[in-house]
């Protein structure tokens, strides 16, 4: 047996065999190992899985084929779908060829001169390619028309030299204003030393001119602007007290002049009220007029009317009364409060109980009649179905 294994190994190593496939996976994978004990050509993956199964398989002596290099791993049999794709870089590449070409193309174009720069420079100058790349990729360009080197005085205007005098004695424009108006690039800029009060006065003068143009204000109107330190309004208590005192004095003067007239009017009003309170009827004349028709009162006695208290007449509120008039008999019904004697109330209660009793009795009779009719002709679906009839 040992001789047979050695002979197989010698035959395999001695012959220059062509590339052979794996006997285990039966694929086009190139065999890397030959096992004389199993007499099989195996690839790298199949050799590892077969000879690591148990201790006996691990003892097998295997021969590496010459066709495979010692550092060769398992070859790819099929191409994967993501083969050829590369992961995109997280950060932009520096010194790209496309960017250098773009810089070469743009270098021929004229550039805008830097504001506040030296005249010798003339144009913008790029310090280095790396610096411009960083500014283009990561930063937003900021336009800064002013330079720290040119600002000599904080209170002065930016591009005006110190020799120029800003003040003028007459109303003509100074040198600073002329320089500002002549320079097209700085049209509309305000000198930094201009006070806020001067600016507000200029705005107010412009507003007055607009009001004159629009017709809101006449040219002859001359007004004085009062400067207020605080915004809002204040109530002067002294002025209010003075106004109140004036009103009180006017009222006192009116009372002194027309006091007699007001007192006469009040006295006449009091007399009218007293006469209206002490108004009385001639009950004798009323009774004589109603003598043929009977007494208008239920009890036949004149009640005592108290005008200061409740004016409701309890003698007329409840019950039924027949009052005779010239047209005929008039029936006065009972009041809202349902008042009356105890006998009338008991009679009403008895009538209600009797009505309720008869209603329940009629309902019970109707129920019994329906039940009898249902028993005479039984139905499959219904309440009154006799069980005996269904069983028979």
UniProtKB/Swiss-Prot annotation:
Alphabetized InterPro entries for the sequence: CCT_domain (IPR010402), CONSTANS-like_Bbox1 (IPR049808), CONSTANS-like_ZF (IPR052453), Znf_B-box (IPR000315)
Region (Disordered): 246-271, 326-346
Top-rank taxon, per record: Eukaryota
Residues reported in the UniProt entry to bind Zn(2+): 22, 25, 46, 51
GO annotation (BP), single: regulation of DNA-templated transcription
Localization, UniProt: Nucleus
Residue span, CCT domain: 345-387
Major subcellular site: nucleus
GO cellular component, one term: nucleolus
Signal sequence annotation: none
Residue stretches of biased makeup (Basic and acidic residues): 259-271
The family this protein is said to belong to: Belongs to the CONSTANS family.
Name this protein carries in UniProt: Zinc finger protein CONSTANS-LIKE 7
Organism the protein comes from: Arabidopsis thaliana (Mouse-ear cress)
């Amino acid at each position: 047996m040992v001789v047979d294994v050695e002979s197989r190994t010698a035959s395999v190593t001695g012959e220059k065999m062509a590339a052979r496939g794996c006997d285990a996976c039966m694929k086009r994978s190139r065999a890397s190992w030959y096992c004389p004990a199993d007499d099989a050509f195996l690839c790298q993956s199949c050799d590892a899985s077969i000879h690591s199964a148990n201790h006996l398989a691990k003892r097998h002596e295997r021969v590496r084929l010459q066709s495979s290099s010692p550092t060769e791993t398992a070859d790819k049999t099929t191409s994967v779908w993501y083969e050829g794709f590369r992961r995109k870089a997280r950060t932009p590449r520096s010194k790209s060829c496309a960017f250098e070409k773009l810089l070469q193309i743009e270098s021929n174009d004229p550039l805008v001169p830097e504001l506040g720069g030296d005249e010798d420079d003339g144009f913008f100058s790029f310090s280095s390619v790396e610096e411009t790349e960083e500014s283009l990729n990561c930063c937003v360009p900021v336009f800064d028309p002013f330079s720290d080197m040119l600002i000599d005085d904080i209170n002065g205007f930016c591009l005006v030299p110190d020799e120029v005098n800003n003040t003028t004695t007459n109303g003509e424009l100074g040198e600073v204003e002329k320089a500002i108006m002549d320079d097209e690039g700085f049209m509309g800029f305000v000198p930094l030393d201009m006070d806020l009060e001067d600016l507000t006065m200029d705005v107010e003068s412009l507003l007055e001119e607009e009001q004159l143009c629009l017709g809101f204000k006449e040219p002859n109107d001359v007004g004085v602007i009062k400067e207020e330190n605080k915004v809002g309004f204040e109530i002067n208590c002294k002025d209010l007290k003075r106004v109140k005192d004036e009103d009180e004095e006017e009222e006192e003067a009116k009372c002194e002049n027309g006091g007699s007239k007001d007192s006469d009017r009040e006295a006449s009003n009091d007399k009218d009220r007293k006469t209206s309170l002490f108004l009385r009827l001639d009950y004798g004349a009323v009774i004589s007029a109603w003598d043929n028709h009977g007494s208008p009162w239920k009890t036949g006695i004149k009640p005592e009317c108290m005008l200061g208290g409740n004016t409701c007449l309890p003698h007329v509120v409840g019950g039924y009364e027949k009052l005779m008039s010239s047209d005929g008999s008039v029936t006065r019904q009972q009041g809202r409060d349902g008042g009356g004697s105890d006998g009338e109330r008991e009679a009403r209660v008895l009538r209600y109980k009797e009505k309720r009793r008869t209603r329940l009795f009629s309902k019970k009779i109707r129920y019994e009649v329906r039940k009898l009719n249902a028993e005479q002709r039984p139905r499959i679906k219904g309440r009154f179905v006799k069980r005996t009839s269904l069983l028979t």
